[in-house]
Amino acid sequence: MFRKTLNSISRRHFSSSSPESPSLYSFLKPSLFSHKPITLSPSLSPPQNPKTLTPDQKSSFESTLHDSLNAHYTDEAWKAFRSLTAASSLPEKRLINSLITHLSGVEGSGESISHRLKRAFASAAYVIEKDPILLEFETVRTLLESMKLAKAAGPALALVKCMFKNRYFVPFDLWGHLVIDICRENGSLAPFLKVFKESCRISVDEKLEFMKPDLVASNAALEACCRQMESLADAENVIESMAVLGVKPDELSFGFLAYLYARKGLREKISELENLMDGFGFASRRILYSNMISGYVKSGDLDSVSDVILHSLKEGGEESSFSVETYCELVKGFIESKSVKSLAKVILEAQKLESSYVGVDSSVGFGIINACVNLGFSDKAHSILEEMIAQGGGSVGIGVYVPILKAYCKEYRTAEATQLVTEISSSGLQLDVEISNALIEASMTNQDFISAFTLFRDMRENRVVDLKGSYLTIMTGLLENQRPELMAAFLDEVVEDPRVEVNSHDWNSIIHAFCKSGRLEDARRTFRRMVFLRYEPNNQTYLSLINGYVSGEKYFNVLLLWNEIKGKISSVEAEKRSRLDHALVDAFLYALVKGGFFDAAMQVVEKSQEMKIFVDKWRYKQAFMETHKKLRLPKLRKRNYKKMESLVAFKNWAGLNT
């Protein structure tokens, strides 16, 4: 048994005496339910000379109570109940439980809930004192659940003490955990400790197994003694109670004791705990070590904190996988003691002991630096990093860098992040792809394009296989920010990298962006580069160029483009790649008519007729009238006979001669 293994703890008997309970109606004190002054309700205590009710009168009040509850008339129901209690009478069991359950409802405003809970408490306390057999266990549970929602710790504890005083023994599992939750939410488990002790005494003295607190309750009591009250005597009492009741401890039980022993500097006791854990078959020491760290931090014994961390690493397994809360507590202690050098030393020593299989985010270095970042001590994280480099000659694990990089990413400090990535690469370490992608995305969001390019180059140099995500992020960001010149330069840099999938759509995006911004020569050069690298232009490529040329009134360039595409769509194989459609026919016709290239325009018309593409002639009539309204055939005949023929053919086709 657990009791027998702790030789230092002498047998203690449960005390049958308990602190004096508050008055049954102390709930009427405003402090129990609210910090605001409240008008006191009259007590439910019957008058000294109660008036006896006749059977008819009692029946009438019960009927009123029943009807009021059904109609949800709370005040009327309460008045009927008060009338009965004023005559030292109680309604039947069903009505009592219905009333208390109704009053325990949490609907409505905060003030009305508080008022109803006072009445529910008063009713329950009165019934417990007068005739507890009328009160159902489930009604008590419902009332306590409402008190939990209302965070009414005082009334909840008063109700339990009232139950004990009047020997109304409700099974512990119906109310124990609720009271624990209420006390915990109220900020302290110390009040629960008294309830725990009394429940243990009743279970033993009255031989009531159902009143026995379970392991969860025992651990809550231990937490109160060790973590909050820091009382060795009370903790030993709880352990003795667990032994008497046959409650087997778990890792959490040992953890609370480890905290207290570390807090008090009782190293021998901690050694005893470790031996006891072996005896109980607990292989994991993670909870034990975490609590020891907390205790040593609280006592200011930072050397012992370092020893525990390094010892946990020597043990291997999950023993060193401490929680974020533990690392935060640890970091606070060291920083408050101005022991940044000690933190750096701990990380360096830990790196020597950590297995190569330990994940980046499971390392001690990651835990400490991540805690610094989470606590807002980013400057301290830098200081630790610099101190590690100074102490270890650059032997800094990747886990130390990751939290700082994530913080930079979150704060969009992308230039600093990029500089740090360069340092990481030069030290021979390699970042995870997800972190690199996140940094590139942050750089693009921050419009720090230089950092994004630098990070991408670093990924390429480190032979990262998956570059697709970052490539798309950069291209999309540049497009959204209308930086086609950077898109072109970036594409030119990566186009021959087999890990990057470049396609015609990427070239089209650059061409479109150049045309949209009026940089037609850059668009033309990009188009030539695209063709040179054997990327096949498609209809979207040509549409972007045509629209750009029309906007800049560069109609001759459209003619050159038509002559180029005309040859392609003549062959069957090329036609499959660059097939004329309605949009492309419309764009070419409009531009060629506006430019006065009627011969080419009629070639487009012929192609559209061959491919059975519908053409709306009205649009080109308008284009002709806007641009060539004053064009005279006699003058044109003298200068260029062929052009005149093309003009006549176009006018006949468009219906301009009628």
From Swiss-Prot:
PPR repeat residue numbers: 214-249, 250-284, 285-320, 323-353, 361-395, 397-431, 432-466, 467-497, 503-537, 538-568, 581-615
Disulphide bridges, residue numbers: none
Domain of life of the native organism: Eukaryota
Keywords attached to this entry: Repeat
Biased composition (Polar residues): 50-61
InterPro entries, A to Z: Pentatricopeptide_rpt (IPR002885), TPR-like_helical_dom_sf (IPR011990)
Location of the region described as Disordered in the Swiss-Prot/TrEMBL record: 1-23, 39-61
Family indicated by similarity: Belongs to the PPR family. P subfamily.
PANTHER family noted in UniProt: BNAC05G43320D PROTEIN, OS01G0788900 PROTEIN
Protein name: Pentatricopeptide repeat-containing protein At1g69290
